[in-house]
């Protein structure tokens, strides 16, 4: 009798079987690029479940998202690149490294301090690597939706002191209404709000990168 495996081990075994010699024809045809957008779709379905406060759906969608991780790890293992254990080990070590105020002796005053520390450690980690990030903005995914990309750009710029902190807005609904009105205005003119924001975000990113570079070149007193 086959000993009962832990659920995670069981999932990995099933995935390996699907990709085996006598596995599923569809699974065998896939590679990293052919399924790259599946993870994006699963994330949005998970967000829907979270916003609906639906635990049953959330449980299922978390499983679907986990499948994408296991699928990519299996393909990578077949290529001799890395396996799931390396993925799990990597993120575990990263969490410990990036939280020295929890696992070490570092001190931070608030959430803002946590983010600054995170970015500083991240920059050190990337130094010397083939994909070394020379800018704080290099890590923003190009395929993020325009609004999410703009949000990340502003957040990183403020963490770097390249943009003012800005005033707090207590009227969350009012801000949402203003944003929706802008979408209506764009649609009335035959423009895609997503495309407009993407272009403007790209323009602002160029300006911020220039400011960042100029500051890096300025000798410190």
Task: Locate the predicted segments by residue.
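Flexible "arm" and connector segments at domain edges
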Residues: 1-61, 67-221
